[in-house]
């Protein structure tokens, strides 16, 4: 559910992987925009019609994306009543901002009017609907469906609205469920943007990514899918889950191509706020850390300080998600073909993902410890050369004599 600016990507991503996707949104205008931009194939007004079309395409093994005009809570409950159980159920509705969440019984236009007339009543209705939606997702999970939160803060918002925490957290967030093993390798949504605006630069960098990360099936699969299916919007750019070691090697190789004139350049390297060592969010990215460090906000600040010391071109301390409940660090590093850029990239592209590996190693993840010790699968033999302790916080020794100071 949720076909907005971020949620609309669910249909495109699903089709890229050969899936049949049914996406629900209460605002017909939003679905129509997704269709106009080729993010969605068609729009229907009933779940029954969507199911019929979905089954037809499943039989033919043909991917398709179907937008259903309706409220997520209503449609999820209807699907359960009809025992329609998809393989995966999630949502990208604006739960983190309940005033933008459309309550049951309202169209997008009606919600706009209601919101302006009685903000308090609107929020009450939105939160009531949100709890119905989450309970439906929990029921899907109980019936064997892969159901999870996609980072919308739905569980936290429902808890704040009175839903018991134990009940709300019967589904996981996707970071704890699926992404954290990647974080342990320093992977995350690493981004490069071709400032020249020339699509040929992006094509050359796609080729370079495949060269640098040869044998990394995650990178290889993604680059080949992305260059085939994703259009260029504004400046040519790519996001890719490269990890510790890979990012540094790639960045230095890009700078070399700019020196040689094979890439017009410059190229800006950045990443999402959701990255291995850049965020603390106890209700999502950093939930259920083995050492109990869900709330430790030192990590993103340390990330920012390290990037500053490494010569990063831009650093931003930010907070979003659940209106002040999280802290994260944004960065940008520039490759312009100069020797100075080599120095900056060598350092910044090491520490930015490296501190994420350290964070997860300190929390107790063995795969992250392996990366730190030079045994990472994609790190190319690189290790993280700082003092490390693999003990719980109350047993860590910081004094030179090895004595723990309280």
Can you annotate each of these PLM segments?
Residues 1, 219-325, 332-338, 342, ...:
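Conserved mixed alpha/beta core segments that line enzyme active sites in large multi-domain catalysts
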Residues 1-2, 69:
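Extended hydrophobic secondary-structure segments that form protein cores and membrane-embedded regions
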Residues 3-59, 63, 90-135, 170-182, ...:
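Catalytic or ion-translocation cores adjacent to nucleophile or general acid/base/metal-coordination motifs
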Residues 15-17, 80-85, 106, 163-166, ...:
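Short, solvent-exposed amphipathic alpha-helical segments in soluble enzyme
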Residues 18-19, 85-88, 139-146, 261-264, ...:
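Structural alpha-beta junctions
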Residues 48-250:
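Core active-site phosphate/anionic-ligand binding loop and the adjoining beta-turn-alpha structural block
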Residues 76-79, 158-161, 277-283, 325-327:
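Short, solvent-exposed polar/charged micro-motifs at secondary-structure junctions
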Residues 356-406:
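Extended hydrophobic packing segments that form well-structured cores
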